[in-house]
Amino acid sequence: IAKKAAAIQISELRKINKIFDKSFVQSIELIASCKGKVITAGIGKSGLIARKVSATLSSVGVSSFFLNPSEANHGDLGQIDKRDLLLVFSYSGNTSEISNMLRYANRFNIKIIGVASKKNSLLLKASDIKILLPQVKESDPTGMVPTTSTSITLLFGDCLAVALMNKIRFSKERFKVFHPGGNIGQNLLLVKDIMVTGNKLPKINVNKSIYDATKVIDQKKLGLVIILEKNKIKGILTDGDARRGIKYYSKDDHLKKIM
């Protein structure tokens, strides 16, 4: 059953190529030129996809948030600014909860990118840019549970984000700014991002005492001190070496003695 479901989805997802038309290009250009935020919206499974698309857009430098149409109907329409644009998802395109949001956007000339699978749907009729998703076969035994339809909608969202990255020349350096945490953040981390430089470096002259060295180690909290002679590095003294060295040397002995 699972293999059959996977096979159905793999086959149906190939239909995604049908959406890469003039409307898709226009949606990229509109989002790239947006002066406000990209507000994604949807109900049910489409709402979950809209949340994910918003999160992806945010991670690639496109300011975005998700707005629940039901909450919008009860006062949250005020979150939408005239500089924003709506990216609304509804596979059928006729979800009743989105109607008030669409009317509000049309009334105040807020641009709408509609993503649906029915050409004459409520959503696409109200949209400035119409993304017509291909109608696909669901992969469950009843053919009714949103499975393939959610997959192809999510695939559209990912393709949209990737195309936008190219349009706005999004780089690894910018991605690092938006994604400092997790495995991705670690993989993007450079030595220069964590290295200690300048006055933060624990440095001491070779003619200073072991005791002076331990004070610098304690102050800088890096576990070691760099020993200099005529501004050239002669070596390092670790916290452990300094503590152990005091057993054999006087704390007033110069560092030269233990180098």
PLM segments and residue spans:
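Terminal peptide-recognition signature
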Residues: 9, 42, 87, 160, ...
